[in-house]
């Protein structure tokens, strides 16, 4: 019989608490972050219509890390490219949803990259 992972359950509780308070609108959509052990994913969501407006990840075919290496550098690059795509789609302001993760490491790096790219949150 499989045991439930306590970290996963605690993160699910954090996500539900955060989602009660945060909701993206068409004027200010929600920037959602998900990370796995190897990759990081970010998307900008309009919760009113239930649609994903812009997305970027390290799995994306257009993702190129270049000379840099490491997961935090990749997260920062994802943030910069996501911000470029968002400004092309006419999105300037977002609400940051860290997805139950602590604001440290790859999550922080992604948000800093998005800010450098021109997003305001």
From Swiss-Prot:
The source organism is Desulfotalea psychrophila (strain LSv54 / DSM 12343)
What InterPro entries has UniProt attached to this entry? Ribosomal_uL18_bac-type (IPR004389), Ribosomal_uL18_bac/euk (IPR005484)
The processes (GO biological process) annotated in the record are: translation
Q: According to its UniProt record, which protein family does this protein belong to?
A: Belongs to the universal ribosomal protein uL18 family.
UniProt keywords (A-Z) are:
Ribonucleoprotein, Ribosomal protein, RNA-binding, rRNA-binding
Entry keyword Ligase? no
Q: How does it assemble?
A: Part of the 50S ribosomal subunit; part of the 5S rRNA/L5/L18/L25 subcomplex. Contacts the 5S and 23S rRNAs.
Annotated GO molecular function terms are: 5S rRNA binding; structural constituent of ribosome
CDD domains in alphabetical order: Ribosomal_L18_L5e
- Name of the protein this chain belongs to: Large ribosomal subunit protein uL18
Q: What is the lineage of its organism?
A: Bacteria, Pseudomonadati, Thermodesulfobacteriota, Desulfobulbia, Desulfobulbales
Recorded hits in SUPFAM superfamilies, A to Z, give: Translational machinery components (SSF53137)
Keyword tRNA processing appears in the UniProt entry: no
Short name of one Pfam family for this protein?
Ribosomal_L18p
What function is annotated for this protein? This is one of the proteins that bind and probably mediate the attachment of the 5S RNA into the large ribosomal subunit, where it forms part of the central protuberance.
Q: Name one GO cellular component term.
A: cytosolic large ribosomal subunit
